[in-house]
Amino acid sequence: MVEFKKANIKMASQNASNIVFRKDYTAPDHQIESIDLSFDLIPTCTEVTSKIIAVPQEDRKSDDLILDGDDLTLVSIKIAGEDSFPGQYDMRPGKLIIHNIKERTEIEIVTRINPRNNLELSGLYMSKNNYITQCESEGFRRITYFPDRPDILAKYRVVIRAPKDYKDLLSNGNLVEQGELLDGRNYAIWEDPFPKPSYLFALVAGNFVAQEQKVTLSDGREALLQIWTEPANKGKTEFAMQSLVKAIKWDEERFGLDLDLDRFMIVATDDFNFGAMENKGLNIFNSKYVLADENVATDQDFANIEAVIGHEYFHNWTGDRVTCRDWFQLSLKEGLTVFREQEFSADMLGDESSRAVKRIDDVRVLRNSQFPEDAGPMAHPIRPESYRSINNFYTTTVYEKGAEVVRMYQTLFGKDGFRRGLLEYINRYDGTAATCDDFLNAMAESNYEDLSQFELWYSQAGTPRISVETKWDEIAKTFTLTLRQNNRTFPGKPAPKPLMIPVKIGILDDAGNDIPLQLEGEDSPDGTSRLLILDEAVQSWTFRNVSTKPLLSIGRGFSAPVIFNTEYTREQLAFLARHDSD
């Protein structure tokens, strides 16, 4: 269940003039060490004061600090505590360029924005009378001037001031202070101890009610969980709260990943445009994915809530603590987190048969939504090479196929090997922005495997088709399986190369029993399922001691996102449906 994000995104025009290429990525010339934000909330004229500490990088190509900005009214700039003067900065469409930042420098920028008239619902906007933010992927530049790119990670301190009828003022991290000002307005101060990219910033102001629960984490710390909702929806958050508790415990037990904040919040509102968003410590959801009335909600409603709550919480480590270097790496956080969500939902079902049904449901989504995308004119790899608008990247390929690519690591290395690789990835890149190659290398090195060919899954589009041929030699008692992979070609693109494809198979005898599998060259059988690695255009495997006419069971567990071209008869398919242990 990952449609919640992209379903409500306004798809960008394909006539945009600027194309961004992955190959053109360059590291930023300046990092932002910290940012202090101050908001004076007024519906049509909110004033935002931003104090950033800019740190030039040793390998920089320019001393100019380039800040992004969209639909902002610039009020003032101070550089190193002094009012700026002409020549110190330039304004260009969508950019504020501050010259000669050669050393660690504090820069204060005051802007004004109009949340009431922000109809793009990107940045800070008003829904009914509530203030809400949506900053993924490039919404923060509609709040203040800032290098709005995911490889800029800064620590945030946020002060919110609002009229007295706004009692709930929320932002990322931990609440430091709150109260009433001398002029009667309310205020709150929040500090996030962890550096994060600007797309994970969040602010919510309004009048809500909160369901609260405290949980004890595996290290003995106590954390406060809060689900905030509009007063009319009070009493409909219990299932969401228990789903959050389960997600926290599951991530502790399955991957050893603890909740890292003293407080974790979810805000549910009827008018949130993105469906659900993983802002660090302050997730914002459309009410559809939080609220459930047991008298009218369906089983699917409850399943969706559990999945989406889990998905956004799991981003805390795979997306927040380790984020993506650039938007070409979107599947690094989304594919990985969809996979984690799928595993969580399956584990919550308990028994193996229920897990199998969940796996079938996930594959059905892939086959019905992503396979057609891979077969059509909009086919693209899970890590595209170019884009006109990042909003066009929120696709079933990036999400669902990306999750299947992540799942193949677990298929190759098992649950223990996958956990080992994931924790190595997090240990290496915690607090930084990473790439798909970084994840692959962590998996490869943790499991002592060469995955250089596996990297093609990130760069080649299309669904591989595998032709299947079988031959049984009754006299020699051998069974030979031949697989041929055919990958889609695209005009103007290099010819596709053979992929590394894990293919899990079994063989059934004429009574429907699994046959012990013994490959040529092996001294004895080893189990009744075998993971074969198809990494050439054509490969064959021969199994010994197959004394009865066999029937192949291929693609067990849906071990790879491929299409098998087989010659099963209807009777053989019915036989597999009755007897296959998978």
Regions found by a protein language model. Give the residues of each.
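Hydrophobic alpha-helical and helix-loop surface patches within well-folded domains
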Residues: 190, 221-475, 481-483
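Surface-exposed beta-strand/loop patches in extracellular or lumenal glycoproteins
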Residues: 53-71, 145-148, 154-163, 437, ...
